[in-house]
Swiss-Prot record:
Binds 1 FAD per subunit. GO terms for cellular component: cytosol. FAD binds at residues 4-34. Monomer. The modification S-8alpha-FAD cysteine is found at C308. Gene3D superfamilies: D-Amino Acid Oxidase, subunit A, domain 2, FAD/NAD(P)-binding domain. Catalyzes the oxidative demethylation of N-methyl-L-tryptophan. This is N-methyl-L-tryptophan oxidase. It comes from Escherichia coli (strain SMS-3-5 / SECEC). Its EC number is 1.5.3.-. Belongs to the MSOX/MTOX family. MTOX subfamily. Its cofactor is FAD. It catalyses: N(alpha)-methyl-L-tryptophan + O2 + H2O = L-tryptophan + formaldehyde + H2O2. It comes from the Bacteria.
Amino acid sequence: MKYDLIIIGSGSVGAAAGYYATRAGLNVLMTDAHMPPHQHGSHHGDTRLIRHAYGEGEKYVPLVLRAQMLWDELSRHNEDDPIFVRSGVINLGPADSAFLANVAHSAEQWQLNVEQLDAQGIMARWPEIRVPDNYIGLFETDSGFLRSELAIKTWIQLAKEAGCAQLFNCPVTEIRHDDDGVTIETADGEYQAKKAIVCAGTWVKDLLPELPVQPVRKVFAWYQADGRYSVKNKFPAFTGELPNGDQYYGFPAENDALKIGKHNGGQVIHSADERVPFAEVVSDGSEAFPFLRNVLPGIGCCLYGAACTYDNSPDEDFIIDTLPAHDNTLLITGLSGHGFKFASVLGEIAADFAQDKKSDFDLTPFRLSRFQ
């Protein structure tokens, strides 16, 4: 059988692509080296932020607004346990923060619902938060967080119900191109398709070593909290920049545990074996202490944590482009630790590619040619 589309990597983007392409009537094969959702990539750990006024640049705003529409649609499949939680997101940092300047600019350009607070205003609204006098907060009322593993599980189930073929726990070892399409080699044999999507995440260079993607080991952890830090008490998800420039992110507490991670830093790795479990690197358990001590002093001890990986591009912007010399193969990689919120729209973009549809978005900033 020759498929219309083969998807290599069925984590966040691949799971979405599998669903949207199958729903569009294509004959699709989803593949993954493991059984998604799993612990081997970048999508585990229960939750991911979704921010609309984007500190990484306004080129992302049209994408994230469409992503939000798709997340809302997906959440309707799980109304008892919604995939998207509109907790709001407070972005904290010095008044001269470049990141916050981008957030404010994005909000202004796209007329987003963002409220600016000074230090006293922040602490009055959320007494659990402490910030210096020179800090401001930009509160995104309509943003919140996503249940990442539930989202992937839901997409995979919906794709299967729609007739998608799924080959999991079966690594792809080779991609070949000819005039007739794309062939992949797996332990289960060869499979052919007219087109392919490569969204293999951290270890995409095992298949395409020429790509400018660097795996980085990252950690996040859950700390002892109480009901003051919960969604029920209107405690928001957050990003926070310390005076030294370190960037943190976190979520409202659930079951008396508040999850937090540090966005910058981490350990450059070159193989899956180097992504050692949480606590095997000395700094893992204390990485969030500077933020907690200064901004959330009421949070208690570290309860547990996890390690994941970022697939970083050189400029930490996404790579969304066809493989050089092979227009039938789309790459979606280099998501650099801020990609999950876009998984829905990136999956839709992949499905449009498979149908020979022109994308509704300007993807020029994400082309591979910018690194030449």
